[in-house]
Regions:
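Active-site beta3 strand of CheY-like receiver
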Residues: 72-78
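Receiver (REC) domain active-site loop signature in two-component systems and cognate sites
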Residues: 83
Length: 184
């Protein structure tokens, strides 16, 4: 399922702030939830199923989740940061750089209690699309879902090894000068 085409004629596409009363049809989405906490996995699963999502797959560790991504090709991934032996950050980097991942462009929401700016930047630099701080609510998760699928940012690959959503500020997208990132 193409996330972009499934959202073209929704209120959020016209600049409307998403709320759970908007009545989005999430039923065809396939979402992978990765968290080592059983209670958090079940909470997120319950919220997602409450939003009408029929296919929610859960994993308790990033190694297993990577294998699931390769076989499932989810429409969206929600992952915790602090997991062992592979962290959520390493999981995101592996997806973005993965040779056998069916869709390196899959939207990824990082779900974590780590909210320091350094951590947010680190997650962004790993290639996440959105950041959601714990504790979560149904409303906050819903807004991140809508934001993630509505996000029109292009994906970029840098010579420094980054692959993921364009990290430049959306306020600067109308920049008309010479792009310093352009290759000669």
């Amino acid at each position: 399922m193409s996330l972009e085409t499934s959202w073209e004629n929704t209120p959020a596409s016209a600049g409307h702030k998403a709320s759970m009363s908007d009545g989005y049809d999430f039923s065809a989405l396939r979402i992978l939830v990765v968290d080592d906490s059983f209670h958090m996995r079940e909470l997120v699963r319950t919220f997602l199923e409450g939003f009408g999502i029929k296919e929610v797959t859960v994993s308790s560790d990033a190694e297993e989740a990577y294998d699931i991504v390769v076989g499932m090709d989810p429409d969206l991934i929600i992952t915790d940061w602090n997991m062992a032996p592979v962290s959520g950050l390493e999981f995101v980097e592996r997806i973005r750089k993965g040779a056998n991942v069916p869709n390196r462009f899959v939207p990824i929401i990082m779900l974590t209690g780590y909210t320091e700016m350094k951590r947010v930047e680190e997650a962004r630099d790993a290639g996440i699309n959105s950041f959601l701080a714990k504790p979560i609510s149904a409303a906050s998760l819903y807004k991140r879902l809508v934001t993630s699928v509505q996000d029109k940012r292009q994906y970029v690959e840098s010579t420094g090894g980054y692959f993921g959503p364009d990290r430049r500020s959306p306020k600067r997208r109308d920049f008309r000068g010479k792009e310093r990132r352009d290759r000669e």
